[in-house]
């Protein structure tokens, strides 16, 4: 049985849009496709704009999961965990876990201080499940994310 890796990211220094852009770039550099999940349509629209406006050739091409040609996009923004672009990675940016995300090889779960207790409960649940490899990532004072405990 293969494991799903779930990386927990507590947003404390940088806002979600900055963190999404940094991590999405790394996903693409690794040759992967990505689904960015948020129930909030306004958040999805803002994130799409941020990804496109990265500057020059460094922009991050993306589209909405319900748009034409979604399958061609390296990054999709979606209200759910569907992946018409055949992504094996998902980034949940509204802090609300969805069990459907366990179908991906890897999931990045972002949460803020208000969602810390729910994330801690989820961490404890996953720690008991051999099918899940859960890890915590912490941001240092320079904005670099590092795996921590």
PLM features: residue spans?
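Short, solvent-exposed amphipathic alpha-helical segments in soluble enzyme
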Residues: 23-26, 50-55, 107-108, 123-127
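Structural motif
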Residues: 12, 37-41, 92-96, 111-113
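Long, hydrophobic N-terminal alpha-helical segment
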Residues: 1-45
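Glycine-rich, aromatic-bearing surface loops/beta-hairpins
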Residues: 105-149
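Hydrophobic beta-strand segments of well-ordered beta-sheets in folded domains
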Residues: 33-35, 87-90, 105-109
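Helix-adjacent hinge/juxtasegments
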Residues: 49-88
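Phosphate- and divalent-cation-binding pockets in alpha/beta enzyme and binding domains
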Residues: 43-50, 118
């Amino acid at each position: 049985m293969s494991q799903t890796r779930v990386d927990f990211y507590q947003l404390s220094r940088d806002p979600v849009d900055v963190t999404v852009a940094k991590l999405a770039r790394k996903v693409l550099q690794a040759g992967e496709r990505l689904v960015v999940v948020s129930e909030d349509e306004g958040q999805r629209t803002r994130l799409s704009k941020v990804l496109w406006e990265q500057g020059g050739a460094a922009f991050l091409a993306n589209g909405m999961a319900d748009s034409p040609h979604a399958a061609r996009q390296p990054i999709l923004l979606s209200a759910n965990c569907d992946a018409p672009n055949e992504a094996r990675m998902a980034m949940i940016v509204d802090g609300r876990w969805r069990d459907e995300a366990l179908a991906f090889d890897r999931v990045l779960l972002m949460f803020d201080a208000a969602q810390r207790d729910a994330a801690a409960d989820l961490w404890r649940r996953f720690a008991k499940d051999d099918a899940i490899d859960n890890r915590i990532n912490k941001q240092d004072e320079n904005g670099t994310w590092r795996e921590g405990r």
